[in-house]
């Protein structure tokens, strides 16, 4: 415990300054502990989490302050998805993941957008569910489902073997176009199986970055037309590239250096503006849990992400600072303890 991690004890847990200064104070404290922008390793991060302890208290002042920052930079209530209101006919829509590529909005494309933001805002309590292996055996399913609005990322499995840990309810699920290409052959031959697999997400919004890269447009449009042809009760929303671009700039200014943010961080960013309270699950980018046990990368498999695309430890650090300052709650331990493993009193 005398490693550099012991310097964490110099950072106070409570009585932080109020307003936007509190988060800045935490960042300065972290830079003192890890000078030269050295990211903490797994063991150091575990010490930090365990030192902070299980207690968490929301800070309404900090919540409102951070929500205003997101509103000023990115306007999620208005720009989260493409709508007829925010995307006029004839607009030159620039893709956020391609240099110098744009699409002129015509009647055909604009007809795919809802009239306005479909959510009744503000949303109350939101669960944002990442897919991290730390969710396995977490028994967080019931707690996740208690939220008013549940966001999930990239079509995660919700079969019976996982529901105790991740729940069953979904109000919004994201779909990376690469999933449509690799798993469903771009819906050229697998439309029926795709529709059947999406039934587990019930009457949810399906959120896709159709206008981020040229390669993502066709698969996203195929999803829209497939769900329409089969008369499903799901609604496709297309991510607004202006929103994605601005969120990327927002986090880059706060020290996240990556080619692209993870889907999870995009969703958390949206939730912090759209929801009154946010709890996040499955956000833990390390190979061992808080008890020192090895865990898989996802709760359902151990497929690793492409190297060099995301900066998951940097993202986690920012989310952890928001947890400490009371802006959001990060669930890293079991939601329900395993009674069979506890000693009788």
From Swiss-Prot:
Entry keywords, A to Z: Developmental protein, Disulfide bond, Glycoprotein, Glycosyltransferase, Golgi apparatus, Lipid biosynthesis, Lipid metabolism, Membrane, Signal-anchor, Sphingolipid metabolism, Transferase, Transmembrane, Transmembrane helix
Listed GO biological process terms: ganglioside biosynthetic process; glycosphingolipid biosynthetic process; protein glycosylation
Intrachain disulfide bonds: 126-275, 140-335
InterPro entries in UniProt: Glyco_trans_29, Glycosyltr_29_Sialyltrsf, GT29-like_sf, Sialyl_trans
Ranges of the Cytoplasmic topological domain: 1-15
Binding site for substrate: 154, 176-178, 262-264
Glycan-carrying positions: 59, 107, 233
Oxidoreductase recorded as keyword: no
Record bears the keyword Thylakoid: no
Membrane topology annotation: Single-pass type II membrane protein
Active site: 310 (proton donor/acceptor)
EC number: 2.4.3.8
Function statement: Catalyzes the addition of sialic acid in alpha 2,8-linkage to the sialic acid moiety of the ganglioside GM3 to form ganglioside GD3; gangliosides are a subfamily of complex glycosphingolipds that contain one or more residues of sialic acid. Glycosphingolipids are required for convergence extension movements during early development. Can catalyze the addition of a second alpha-2,8- sialic acid to GD3 to form GT3. Can use GM1b, GD1a and GT1b as acceptor substrates to synthesize GD1c, GT1a and GQ1b respectively.
Record-given protein name: Alpha-N-acetylneuraminide alpha-2,8-sialyltransferase
Organism whose genome encodes this protein: Xenopus tropicalis
Name of the coding gene: st8sia1
């Amino acid at each position: 415990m005398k490693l550099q991690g012991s310097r964490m004890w110099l950072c106070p847990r409570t009585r932080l300054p109020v307003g936007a200064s509190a988060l800045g104070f935490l960042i300065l404290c972290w830079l003192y502990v890890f000078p030269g922008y050295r990211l903490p390793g797994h063991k150091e991060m575990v010490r930090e989490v365990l030192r902070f302890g299980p207690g968490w208290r929301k800070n309404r002042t900090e919540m409102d302050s951070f929500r205003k920052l997101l509103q000023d930079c990115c306007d999620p209530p208005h720009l989260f998805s493409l709508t007829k209101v925010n995307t006029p006919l004839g607009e030159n829509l620039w893709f956020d993941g391609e240099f110098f590529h744009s699409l002129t909005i015509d009647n055909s494309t604009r007809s795919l957008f809802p009239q306005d933001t479909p959510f009744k805002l503000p949303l109350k309590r939101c669960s944002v569910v990442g897919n991290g292996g730390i969710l396995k055996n977490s028994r967080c399913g019931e707690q996740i489902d208690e939220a008013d609005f549940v966001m999930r990322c990239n079509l995660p499995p919700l079969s019976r073997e996982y529901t105790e840990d991740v729940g069953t309810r979904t109000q919004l699920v994201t779909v990376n176009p690469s999933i449509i290409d690799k798993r469903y052959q771009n819906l050229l031959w697998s439309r029926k199986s795709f529709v059947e697999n999406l039934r587990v997400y019930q009457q949810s919004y399906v959120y896709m970055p159709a206008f981020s890269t040229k390669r993502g447009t066709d698969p996203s449009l195929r999803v829209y037309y497939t769900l329409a042809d089969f008369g499903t009760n799901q609604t496709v929303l297309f991510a607004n590239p202006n929103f994605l671009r601005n969120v990327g700039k927002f986090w880059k200014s706060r020290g996240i250096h990556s080619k692209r943010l993870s889907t999870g961080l995009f969703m958390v960013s949206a939730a912090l503006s759209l929801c009154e309270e946010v709890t996040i699950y499955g956000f833990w980018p390390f190979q061992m849990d808080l008890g020192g046990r090895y865990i898989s990368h996802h709760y359902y498999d151990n497929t690793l992400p492409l190297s060099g695309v995301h900066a998951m430890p940097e993202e986690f650090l920012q989310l952890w600072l928001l947890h400490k300052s009371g802006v959001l709650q990060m669930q890293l331990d079991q939601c329900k303890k395993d009674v069979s493993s506890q000693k009788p009193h």
